[in-house]
A protein has these predicted regions:
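Bacterial N-terminal signal peptides that target proteins for export
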Residues: 1-9
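Bacterial N-terminal signal peptides
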Residues: 9-18
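Sec/Tat signal peptide C-region and signal peptidase I cleavage site
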Residues: 19-23
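Extracellular/periplasmic metallocenter environments
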Residues: 24-31, 100-149
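N-terminal edge beta-strand
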Residues: 32-62
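Beta-strand cores of secreted/periplasmic/IMS beta-sandwich domains, seen most often
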Residues: 53-78, 110-119
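Beta-strand acidic-aromatic groove motif in beta-rich domains, primarily in extracellular
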Residues: 74-81, 124-126
């Protein structure tokens, strides 16, 4: 596996919390600031959960997507259509699995991807444990809406 940053740098591609279970977008601050968007993965009664089921974010703006894994197990995160439609600027904290089109978030870790968000639309995402199939409780949508002007 190659690092996601290396893949992005090589390709320059435009090619996928308010508390542990909520996503939150915060208005950008001064010039150069990015809007943070968080997806939280946690284990509840032995079952993996990812929140929120629907995260709203502005279209065609700089964002920092953070995937926060508060569980004791590694969690894979995939949002291939979202990442393919976005312009990735930089990333950190993970290795991109090119063959599987996902990255893994280590236990009790946070990874981030800074990007220019795509055009408005609904983009499916999923969190899942290695070897498992995503379920309704581990999947959701990144809802990209026209940016407020």
């Amino acid at each position: 596996m190659r690092t996601f940053t290396g893949r992005l740098t090589a390709c320059l591609l435009a090619t996928g919390i308010g508390g542990p279970t909520m996503a939150q977008t915060v208005s950008p601050g001064p010039s150069g600031a990015v809007t943070p968007v968080e997806i939280a993965a946690e284990t509840i009664n032995g079952d993996l959960r990812c929140r929120p089921p629907r995260a709203r974010l502005p279209a065609e703006e700089r964002l920092e997507l953070r995937v926060v894994n508060s569980s004791e197990r590694p969690v894979a995160f995939a949002a291939p259509k979202f990442f393919n439609a976005s312009q990735i600027v930089e990333s950190g904290g993970f290795t991109w699995d090119i063959a599987q089109d996902r990255f893994v978030v280590a236990p009790r870790s946070t990874v981030w991807v800074r990007l220019q968000s795509p055009v408005p639309g609904e983009y499916y995402y999923s969190c899942f444990e290695q070897g498992q199939i995503p379920t309704d409780s581990t999947s959701g949508f990144l809802i990209v809406v026209p940016a407020a002007r």
